[in-house]
Amino acid sequence: NILNSDLTFGIGPAGTGKTYLAIAVGVSLYINNLVDKIILSRPAVEAGERLGFLPGDMKDKVDPYMQPLYESLQDCLPGRQISKMLDEKIIEIAPLAFMRGRTLSNAFVVLDEAQNTTKMQMKMFLTRLGENSKMVITGDTSQIDLPKGIESGLVSAIRILKNVKGINFSIFNSEDVVRHHMVTKIIKAYEVFDK
């Protein structure tokens, strides 16, 4: 589905491979000279923490937070090649806040953990899409870490964009989990409890 659409949403529970699949497609498109760069981003909200409260400079704050993106890259490319591509700005990993004002052309763009965007952040990110680019938005609407009363940008995007031609929505469920078999059981238990 990613290959057939310029904008794809991958929505589902933890462990379904949403981020890995998106990054693997991006790496494949780059290797086949179909995009010039890979841009990976996440909102700076995670389980109640914000970057400003973490110790160190911006790189110290951002790198651990972006670790899941690095891990998915490491499943697709050798470490030395990742380092070289990062140095040459072929791969860019940056917080969502750094995307404002940009046009992302000739790129494969991934927004991970999109359930933690606000409606305005999501709109801002989606409107960065430039010519000859593909964008994948991944998230889990059951793991929203935003303050109470703030609607998730992912939830609002699903509602607003569900009927827009050319936008693809791929929905995963607990049956799609590829992590440890206990993850499926945990997700199902929470689904039952939350009903």
Where are these regions (language model features)?
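Conserved helicase motor core of SF1/SF2 NTP-dependent helicases
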Residues: N1-L111, Q115-K195
